[in-house]
Amino acid sequence: RSFATVLKLMEEYPEYKFMSSQAQLYAFVKEDYPEVYEGIKKMIAAGRWEVEGSMWVESDTNVTSGESLVRQFLVGKRFFKDEFGVDNKIMWLPDVFGYSAALPQIMKKAGINYFMTTKISWNEFNKVPYDTFMWKGIDGTEILSHFSPSTDCFDEGDCWQTTYNAYLNPEHILGGWHRYSQKDLNKEYLCTFGHGDGGGGPTRDMLEMGHRMTKGIPGCPKVKQEFAIDFYHDLEKEVKGSRRLPKWSGELYLEFH
């Protein structure tokens, strides 16, 4: 449903760009809905549909063995390369319940340079102090990480939880900017919008609002639609060599569930 909706909206909104992870989803669509799959391939070739995420599925990382995690990257990246000619560079895990300290090393050896999530904001007791930082693994490997701060909350003391299901409207965009912890380091943040966790994707209302916000609304940050990998490339250039770029060593433990 989400993929078919996206293809329809792309016909109506030429500036609209979309990203989806999880090779397994594409494999299902290829087998069951070949006409949708061909439409996806056309949009990828046109530079409007981004395939990223690197893993076969958005995998658990707490109880999963190291070999299984390696195979998630191996099989996932191979599928995206063979089917679409894309070499993934982002580990995209917006809704996974904690992140093993072994991941930075595995990611780097798999050719992954960047990490994204929002779930860690669900901590029950301690707010993770950073949204943009270097994540240091067990062996010392470091990965540039960014937690999407999208939220409709404006009270900085209470804005713990963020969402990957943001509405593309001034409330969520401005709320995310208030919530973003590294404004002294970087002047942009990544906002993922649309109906997820059940599917549906973005709506016409969101795209109409996004079109207007691209032009600028007084008192609200401007938005632009671009691929996640482009955001990370710009982020890396912005923070590279900065002494203000914080580091987090070890496991990213989720204090919830």
Which stretches of residues belong to each language-model region?
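Catalytic-domain carbohydrate-binding cleft regions of carbohydrate-active enzymes
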Residues: 1-257
